[in-house]
From Swiss-Prot:
NCBIfam families: guanyl_kin. Essential for recycling GMP and indirectly, cGMP. The gene is gmk. Keywords: ATP-binding, Cytoplasm, Kinase, Nucleotide-binding, Transferase. This is Guanylate kinase. CDD domains: GMPK. Residues 5-188 form the Guanylate kinase-like domain. Its main location: cytoplasm. Signal peptide: none annotated. It comes from Colwellia psychrerythraea (strain 34H / ATCC BAA-681).
Length: 218
């Protein structure tokens, strides 16, 4: 029997290190990599950029198709950003979870609120910078944004951080290796929940209890 995958949401202000943590988590040599994991691929109406492939970076669709999917209630969450739509397909996520794949959604706090309403069992994680000063230093260290853009990102970061207490877990990314260990621990913790183990270890407990099957507990 396939053990259903877990759904995780990771949210963070720009510069907190969320993308780096996700990439490190998914590396084959990570402690959590014994089980299949994948970052969700969003649907979007924006044009593909050079080097982006349909189905790999995004699912590129027309505005008409996206709005049709909205009318069908096909998204766990969606938003319009700078005139383009972005959304997370409910059917695609559920298909991956049913195959035993742990799925990670890289979305903001507003998207997290939408997903929680549809899937209360989702595990939500907020990645926080260690300080305003460090966050600004990281943003400036990229060398790609003007002072005006950095000021805007800092204001947006404050708005993002004001919702930290809506999440199940908070990781402060001060030391990257420690933050990665914290994230890995959360993922492994969810896999050890009784609901998961009663399926994964069904044969074991059937033998221990001398019964044909053990019904998963809520």
């Amino acid at each position: 029997m396939i053990v259903p995958g877990n759904l995780f949401i990771l949210s963070a202000p720009s510069g907190a290190g969320k993308s780096s943590l996700i990439n490190a988590l998914l590396k084959p040599d990570n402690q959590a990599s014994a089980r299949a994991m994948q970052v969700s691929i969003s649907h979007t109406t924006r044009d593909a950029r050079p080097g982006e492939n349909n189905g790999e970076h995004y699912h590129f669709v027309s505005v008409e198709e996206f709005k049709k999917q909205i009318s069908l209630n096909a998204f766990y969450e969606y938003a319009e950003v700078f005139g383009n739509y972005y959304g997370t397909s409910e059917a695609a996520i559920d298909a991956q979870l049913s195959q035993g794949i742990d799925v990670f959604l890289d979305i903001d706090w507003q998207g997290a609120q939408q997903v929680r309403m549809k899937k209360p069992g989702v595990t939500t994680i907020f990645i926080s910078p260690p300080s305003k000063e460090e966050l600004e230093s990281r943003l400036r260290g990229r060398g790609q944004d003007s002072d005006e853009v950095i000021a805007s990102r800092m204001a947006q970061a404050q708005a993002e951080c004001s919702h930290y207490n809506e999440f199940d877990y908070v990781i402060v990314n001060d030391d990257f290796e420690q933050a990665l260990l914290d994230l890995t621990t959360i993922v492994n913790n969810q896999r050890l929940k009784c609901r998961q183990q009663s399926i994964a270890q069904q044969s074991l407990f059937s033998k221990l209890l001398n019964i044909e099957a053990v019904e998963p507990t809520e």
